Amino acid sequence: MSTATPLAPTPVTTTDVLIVGAGPVGLFAAFQAGVLGLRCELIDVLDRAGGQCTELYPEKPIYDIPAVPGCLAQDLVDRLLEQCAPFAFPMHFGQRAESLSEIPRQPAPDGHAAHERLLVTTDGGKRFDVSAVLICAGAGAFAPQRVSLPEAPALEGRHVHYAVRDVSRFAGKRVVVAGGGDSALDWALALRKVAARVTLLHRREGFRAADGTVAEMREAVAAGEMDFVVGMLGALRTEGQDGPLTEVEVRTRDGSTVLPADELVALYGLVSEPGPIAQWDMDMRAGRILVDTTTYESSRRGIFAAGDIAYYTNKQKLILSGFHEAALALRRAYHYAFPEKALVHVHTSNNAALKEKLTHA
């Protein structure tokens, strides 16, 4: 009689603060955590940092950031990444915060109750043991717009993908990348280096992507390094009822065509939804998290919110408001991470070690 070997549990990452969302507010929060001496890690459902600024309007001008008369949304993200880079906090992309539970601790030797910690698990299986969670998820978790074909759900996660988490899984495969934005073109260009063949599929000749990226794609097509087809997904064909993907049927202006395919990467853009966070037993208002404006803590101890996801009277949906909210939230979170320490305010310019880190990164 044989017995199956049990799967090893996913390792748990222990840190002080988990920041949910790597948009502008989440990135500034990471910088603030570093300034305060907090360890942190960031997760985001997207495949890169920047949130809405990167995915929806990278070329949008922004004029209301203090001391920055004007910049493009992507430029702001790039500057925030540069600002928090000295602390080298890990960022985990393609990960949606899924479940939250409390980790009871044994009483301390002196008889005082130990601080309860939190365990956050993502849909990708990552687990984080933290003192506090700061949710900077904008209007909610951005979820990919899914393929609407009836055969798609059974193939999701196996042969139909909405993000590229591991390039190596596409090595030697015939890949169709569907979409017309920056993500679709970027990944089509990247995957052509490892895949047997890449075909970019878009419903029209024009793209919602940077001119330079479009030019690079057209050069790759002209050089025979990849293919480009104008059309829309019509059907997904498999080998048998539950077998792997073999072909993608495409509806074109002249009828239809069939593309050989082992993998489909659909990058149609994003839709906003509260996601599992809405089930974390916090007081919510219209899909946003009700917070105390003294600390920006939610009704659940140790869970904070900053940015558009936070709700309070006279809330202003401005990036600069999110910066302020994150800064105050982390100062309260510090007391959960280090209950025995007093947080002493120090100007960054007067802290020699911090100044050295920030100026010589």
From Swiss-Prot:
Reactions accelerated catalytically: 2 reduced [2Fe-2S]-[ferredoxin] + NADP(+) + H(+) = 2 oxidized [2Fe-2S]-[ferredoxin] + NADPH
Known EC number: 1.18.1.2
Top-rank taxon, per record: Bacteria
Keywords: FAD, Flavoprotein, NADP, Oxidoreductase
Cofactor: FAD
UniProt record similarity statement: Belongs to the ferredoxin--NADP reductase type 2 family.
UniProt name for this protein: Ferredoxin--NADP reductase 1
